[in-house]
């Protein structure tokens, strides 16, 4: 997605405008400058000028170098800890697949994510003992070996667990991906199949807002972080609810998209630019977008780029080329990237090929990542997406780094293991390398003390899952349903849907249980005779009702309220199911027992969300799902899909 080149017909006039703009920024700030620019654009359009909308910015970092917040941690310790985790994650997968073993696993994904996860764990993500509540992490499923590698250093899992990665029969192994059912005190959220994590994260973030608005739990300072792959964003579920997240003003939600430019078979957008594409998609939907493309070694070159040639070449170069650069060497980059313009060759003429090779991507620069994460957690009024450019298989050498085969690489020969050891400075002697031993220093080393200190300062270790809520709800006696049951005992017929609505109404009236019930609708309340609840308990809304409903003069008018109890998802079965999951797992994620009731139209409502239903089981969800009507008895005439 390359921006069209524009020709400047009057450079002097352009310079005058730019100088004026710089003066406004200096004297009155960027907000005033933005207002003036938007006013000028609006005036141009109103006078008939055509100014097409563009959701894209230049192919550089969103946060200028001068405005970056510097990472406060001990970077030497953090780099060594990351290196040990990289080694142990690699060793976990390679040892699992040694000899005739072919149990699978993935090395390359975590290698591209390691810096981001390290910064998050060391500086941002609040644990279960934090006074302001724990953050919720949706970890990219294929990066699970790296999370296990961290937990191993923390002492939360043993070497025996690592050896038994994907060997769980005897209860001493580790699950392939995040599975709460298999590791009930560790993983919180299953993020495979791909696409489920981003979708569920959005509705978890909205449910935190819902709990806060209804005074059930203090979730004001909690964040939901979702790590996704750039290839994963092609899943309809990944992007399908981003408009809702902006509409609901979910500033407690952060997406981090790991843009390593590759999926299993090859490039994500070989002929385009996935970061630019996602930027326009998210910005158009109303998100705050932060791009982390270039590392600090690029800063001096970008500072010299007064005529914008470097930035233009960065924009014109497609992702397939960027992948190729990191699959080769510095000489190749000099020829094929900087060689695109004579001024760029001159710019790097005093740099060696090794210097050029060290020009890093933003996702492998802790300071760039920290600045982006810090900006994201401080942003108000919008969800944030951080688009981070990385290298798939970072550190894996010629067998996988930037290669199309990176995702499938599970076995490494001795030479590659030797190179990996040297690259990350792992203190394992040559005569031990063939066995690929796990590395864990003594607990009293400065790095290990630092590892524990950082998590203790943030409220404990993550990921961690609560298996049982501290509270107990008082269940009403069966005679609460007497108004529903007694007429039927006398022989009066009643539909199952009507019985459900009456039972639900009785439960909502219970002073103890009623406030914890979460009725979830997907635009079918009138079908099921539930519209009476609109006025009774209200429909949750992020802001007060700004209009007078057309049926305001009726008893069952459409009432939206910031403290409303109903979650109305519209024509959106996946959204309804994701809200149900958020409520049904609240006993674990929020230490608050909630009881969701999701009734959907016919059984095909479940068929639309089968994978989410599987995820709900994995998460040990507790609630009620109801297929609202039976096709063979009440939907004749609706057609084959409804009747089956």
Positions of predicted regions on the chain:
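N-terminal amphipathic, basic-rich helices that act as targeting or association modules
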Residues: 2-154, 420, 494-510, 521
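Non-catalytic terminal/interface segments that mediate subunit docking, oligomerization
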Residues: 68-89, 110, 125-128, 136, ...
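Long, well-ordered, tryptophan-enriched scaffold segments
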Residues: 259-487
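A glycine-rich helix N-cap at a beta->alpha junction
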Residues: 156-168, 247-258, 280-287, 614-632
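Short secondary-structure boundary/capping segments
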Residues: 152-156, 240-245, 269-279, 296-299, ...
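Acidic, glycine-rich active-site loops and adjacent beta-strand->loop/helix elements
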Residues: 141-145, 168-169, 225-235, 258-263, ...
